[in-house]
Amino acid sequence: MKKDYKTSVPQEKLDASEAERQRLLAKWRFEPTSMWYLQRLHDKTLDAIVEDTLAEGSYPEHNFNVRDGALPQSSPIVAERLIRFFSEPGDWVFNPFMERIPHLLVANYLGRNAVGQDLCKSFYEHDVAKVKRRIANNAILDSEHNYIDHEEPTYLRSYLNGLVFDLYLGDSRCLPWSNNSMDFCINSPPYFSTIYYSDEPEQLGTGEAIGGGDKPTYEEFLKGLQDVYRECYRVLKPGKFMAVLLNDFRMDKIFRAYHADLIPYMEEIGWHLHDIIIYNLSLHPLQAVFTSQLARDFHMAKQHEYIEIYRKSE
């Protein structure tokens, strides 16, 4: 006789499970799957941050050939999902590569305490101007020289939804925050020497060459990046998460599987790879010139970006 392995679940349990699912979906505002697609946020303020980001060119000058066409133009949309999912209102969210200022603007708008640091003075000044336009009189700090906004000797504090937004200028291999003080980290690391960021000699990937030395190797670049993520590990609370937005790239005709190459360096620190999300960029049109170059070089156009989720040990 054939056995019936079906188990009956009481209707009240099914109802409770569905109610909890709806509660979480209302909180997150998206289905938590491993493949994400571009969509607007349906929030006037957040959409304005997205439009502001695209209009003003908040990202470094990218070479289409380096990333085979994949540009991180929808970063604020990704940030909104990640911040809602991995943090709660009142949590401390930080970014050690502050050229991604939309991440912090989104975090602040969602009721998180947002802080960031960046080495590049030009990015820093651009970000300060952007934040001042959005949130007047924020605390603008310099972790090395201890002056405010390059002019005022006063510590300025202003509040948006009761939260402080602090921006620091300095090398992220030495973060200014205490051990186990942060709740979530969101960042997009530099792309070796494929993209020009600034002339600071401490700049990962290009700094030594700018200072007159030899250009670092790819492995030396990853070791330097490891020092930044070691600091992120230090300041993040046990059991909390970090999201790293990155993509693979080409340099000197060599394909670098950046998203995979980074993982062993992270695990050496103590990070646990918790998840990988694929962000689909297929709605971004390819430029005609670039399409013809893809055909000539037999490269596939990248229409995705990786989001690696790491977790600090409990």
Q: Over which residues does each language-model region extend?
A:
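Class I S-adenosyl-L-methionine-dependent methyltransferase catalytic core
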Residues: 1-314
